[in-house]
Structure formats: structure tokens, C-alpha cells
Amino acid sequence: VFKIKISIDALVNSHYNLMCHCAYISNFNIKRNFTEQKEETAFWSVEVKELIYLPIEKLTEGMELARNIPGINPMLPFAVTGCKLSERMIGRMKTIGVQGAYICTSITQGIEPEDFVEPELKAKMLTSIRDVFDQSLKKFTFQSSRQVYEEIAKVAESVVMNVLNKDKYLFQMIDIRDYDGYTYSHSLYVGILGVLLGKYIGLSISNLNDLALCGLLHDIGKTDIPIDITNKPGPLTSDEFEIMKQHPSLSYKKLGDHIVISQAVLQGVQTHHEKFDGTGYPFGLSGKDIPLYARILAIADVYDALSSTRPYRKAWSPRRIFDYLTSCSNTHFDPELLTAFLHCVSAYPIGTIVHLSDGSSAVIKDNTPGFSLRPIIRFISPPQKAGIDVDLSSELFNLTIIDDDEC
């Protein structure tokens, strides 16, 4: 815990979102500071608490939330920053599919996770995506289809600007989401991940906007699939899977019939389940015959899906996801794009707790591009190592992270 001073003017002019960054007003003692011009400036004394991310099974009663837990409505959180967890709350979080939470601690001073998308912007994006999907369930009119396009185009532009404004290519986000909101958050993150990869390989802003639209709309055809199939809490039967396989073409038709959108976007949406070796659907395209946007979306789609807890399975561990993606190079995925993608994402986001091969525990301090599975860590146990920082990408340290499913 440490204290900083922030000018009230700075708070107003810079729109500091203290709650989202785990800052708490500890003393409402206004100090007077007169400049040479005798202008008066007031300061708040602000106490900033550090945080770590813990998976749901590690949460215990009495822990203090360091960030909001979103509810079904993105604008209305299930639990707010600063509240103390109870056993009942933890049980409810498990029921709605929350994977973990940021918790206040004094262990990680100087380690601050950076939101890839600011929470307020993310909530607005998710609300817009939900509105678009809800509208797609109704009969489109000329006016409603134009409104849908304008709304989703604004989200796409926000996604692109958000990615372009990031200095780092590394995507590191722990998404605290519920089952009911999966479709919307999945669409958003496929858009973000696609644009991130597109930026890395040098696509133009116009192409990035198209790519964002592809990601945001790639699953909109699922609104025409029976809900007992899309929301089935278990593996699909072969007949159900054949119905589910129709969603790329349904997305293409729904968008093509009602919304003025580029052919490149439509093709990307329609072919995002094609595989590099020709075994995908709906057309069995292979290699570079698959549109570029679709080859990018294929990677982003699978990565986000495996990173997410679903009603019928837990989220995969980072190492398992990376191993799976690598094993699918040149079969499911374009190998060049996959190599680039793995440079763009971090397996272990800053602030997460990990276990190491020597039995010690650590918190992720930072990540190095190209070494996603070997980040910079800070030991938290055993006591004789606590507080020591180590870069696992260095050959000097023969340590590896042991994922939960390996313990």
C-alpha cells in the first residue's frame, strides 16, 4: 500500500477512473497549495492498493475485490470493487461461470495489470454488440439495418483505435465474464485479437476496420440456430453439429441481405471455419485460397474459445492452448500467421499467480514478446525468495511454470 497526491483538476480533466485501477480515497483531507499566481489547488490523499488475479477455486471468504465482477448486463456489475467476498458470493460466481477475480494484496507493489480495453469502453462495446445480436433476432427493416451497421461500425472503429494506441503488441487480458455473456465477449475478443494480429503483420487501417467487423459479426448467424443447440451444456451430437456448421453461411446471408457491408468482410465471416489443409467448412478451401481475414479469424476464434470456461468444460491452461495451436500449424492454421499470433499474446497476464517447477510460487511481473511461456516473475514463496524478480526467458534460470492441470 502506498499513497499518492492527485490534483482535483487533474482528476476532472484527465478522467481518472480510480475505482477501475483499485485506488481508494483514504483521507478526504484537502491540502491547500498556493502557486506564485496565488491560484488555489486542492489535493486528495489517495491510497492505492496492489492486486493479484486468483482463479475462482482459490478465492476465499473475506478477500477484498480489487476490480468489479461484471453482471449479465455489462453496465451493472455483479459485485463492485472494495466489497468483501462471502462463501455465498463465491458460490454464485461459480454458478454464473466467473473464472476468477482480482484481489487486493500487499505482495505485488509496482506490478499493475494494464487493461487492454478500459472497463468503461469494454462495457459500452459489449452493450452495442448485444443490441446488434438482439436486433438480428427480429425482422430487419431498412431503418433498423442501417442503425445496426452504424452501431457495429462504431464498435469496430473503437476496437481498431484501441489496438493502434497500444505501444505493446502483447495482448494480456484476464476476462471476468459469465456464461450468458459469452457470445458477446467472444465476438469482441475475436475482433480485438484479429486486429492485433492484423496490426502486427502491417495491414492498413481500412483493412483493420474490415477485420474488426469480421470478428464482431462472425457468429451472428448463430441467432438462427436453435438455442438448445447453441447453449447446450455438453458436446453436440453429430446431427446437432451439422446444424451448427450452418452458422457461417447463415451469417453471410443475414449480413449480405440486410446490411451494406464489403464483400471482403462477408467472405471472412463465411469462411472462418475453413482449415489450412482443406478439411474445414463450408467449402473445404485450403491454403491461401482461404481469404486472409478468415485465416486470421480462425486463430483468434479458437484461441479465445479455449481460453474461456464453458458450461461443459473449464478454460484450458495457457501451456495447453499454446501446445494445441502449435500442433495445428499447417493443418488448421496458416503457419506464418500462427507464428505471428503467438508473438502477439501473452500466456500469463500480469498479476496472475503461478506455480514453478521447483515448488515455489510467483506473480507475473511482465512479459517479453516471443517468450510467452517464459515471463518475468516475482517470487512470493518460499519466504527466502519472496520479492526477488527473475526473467524466465534467460538461460540462467532452469525454471518452468507448472499449469494447474499439470500439478
Residue ranges and their predicted role:
Residues 232-253, 275-378:
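Divalent-cation-assisted or electrostatically stabilized phosphate/pyrophosphate-binding catalytic cores
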Residues 106-245, 250-260, 264:
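Acidic/His-rich, divalent-metal-binding segments that scaffold phosphate/diphosphate chemistry
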Residues 2-6:
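Extreme N-terminal basic, low-complexity initiation segments
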Residues 48, 73, 166, 261, ...:
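Short flexible coil/turn linkers enriched for glycine and charged/polar residues
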Residues 28-150, 382-384, 391, 395-407:
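Membrane-cytosol interface segments
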Residues 8, 12, 16-36, 42:
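Short, positively charged and aromatic/hydrophobic N-terminal segments
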